[in-house]
Amino acid sequence: MNRKEFFAASVTGALGCCGLAVPDGAASAQTTNPPGPDREKEFVKNWLTDLFDTMDQELDEVTKAKLLAGCGRGCFRRHQFKQDIARLGKGSIDALLDAYKKNFQVWREGGVIHVRYGAVNKQCYCPAARYHPVKPRDMHCECTRATHQTIFETALGRPIRVEIVESLRRGGPTCHFVAHVA
């Protein structure tokens, strides 16, 4: 048994002993009334609303954008298909466009690459964005902007400026970004 297995077994045993020491009413209440998915969803919605409201009240636009950009870079690291786009587009704008086309509408206009989530969408693709209210100049879109920036920078090996053209959360019919590659 390695240390990790030993620790897991010890914690399980300790928790089992603690459960025996809990009065009957408390133990049965804990096991028969776990929070349901709807309660957890409501909690997450409220928590995200509070977070974004506080960010709006306490932080300047630059700081908010930096925070959400960190989330966007994390999203890139967490999702293999995003890493695959960068890997398949490594070192070549044309290869990057081909890799992007598997999941997005993309086209080039001179030194600008357009990335669009179709002409019209019914809802935001980000699951986290669905759990807090839409606002004008919605900062959540900075997360997605940073994800695309990370894909471009990883593939091309240099800083790339990515801008939000429009987004569902900001009142547009779709999400549309431009990457300045020239």
State where each predicted segment sits.
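Short amphipathic alpha-helical segments
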Residues: 144-152
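N-terminal secretory signal peptides and thylakoid transit peptides that target proteins
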Residues: 1-14
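Short terminal or interdomain "cap/linker" segment that borders an active site or interface and mediates
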Residues: 7, 159-182
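Hydrophobic h-region of N-terminal signal peptides that target proteins for export
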Residues: 16-20
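Amphipathic interaction/junction segments at domain boundaries or subunit interfaces
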Residues: 58-140, 146
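A short, structural micro-pattern
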Residues: 107-109, 156, 171
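Short secondary-structure junctions
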Residues: 152-159
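C-terminal segment of N-terminal export signals and the immediately downstream linker at the start
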Residues: 21-57
